[in-house]
Curated annotation (Swiss-Prot):
Protein's UniProt keywords contain Magnesium: no
This protein's encoding gene: psbZ
Database matches in InterPro entries: PSII_PsbZ, PSII_PsbZ_sf
Cellular component aspect of the GO annotation: chloroplast thylakoid membrane; photosystem II reaction center
Keywords, ordered alphabetically: Chloroplast, Membrane, Photosynthesis, Photosystem II, Plastid, Reaction center, Thylakoid, Transmembrane, Transmembrane helix
Coiled-coil ranges (or none): none
Function recorded in the entry: May control the interaction of photosystem II (PSII) cores with the light-harvesting antenna, regulates electron flow through the 2 photosystem reaction centers. PSII is a light-driven water plastoquinone oxidoreductase, using light energy to abstract electrons from H(2)O, generating a proton gradient subsequently used for ATP formation.
PANTHER family associated with the record: PHOTOSYSTEM II REACTION CENTER PROTEIN Z
Organism field: Pelargonium hortorum (Common geranium)
Alphabetized HAMAP family for the sequence: PSII_PsbZ
Family designation: Belongs to the PsbZ family.
Topological type in the membrane: Multi-pass membrane protein
Protein name: Photosystem II reaction center protein Z
TM ranges: 8-28, 41-61
């Protein structure tokens, strides 16, 4: 269970860093938002899901 928790935290941190860099790049590009909004929404949904997963796994471990 600890390995699953560690992998979930790593995935959350990785997704956060990707979104931290990717979202401003999408907004700065000329037609970035209209062509990449599905990717941004998918990444945001993944991030929210990982936050809940880490919370659930944390409650099971402690």
């Amino acid at each position: 269970m600890t390995i699953a928790f560690q992998l979930a935290v790593f995935a959350l941190i990785s997704t956060s860093l990707i979104l931290l860099i990717g979202v401003p790049v999408v907004f700065a590009s000329p037609e970035g938002w209209s062509s990449n909004k599905n990717i941004v929404f998918s990444g945001t949904s993944l991030w929210i899901g990982l936050v809940f997963l880490v919370g659930i796994l944390n409650s099971l471990i402690s």
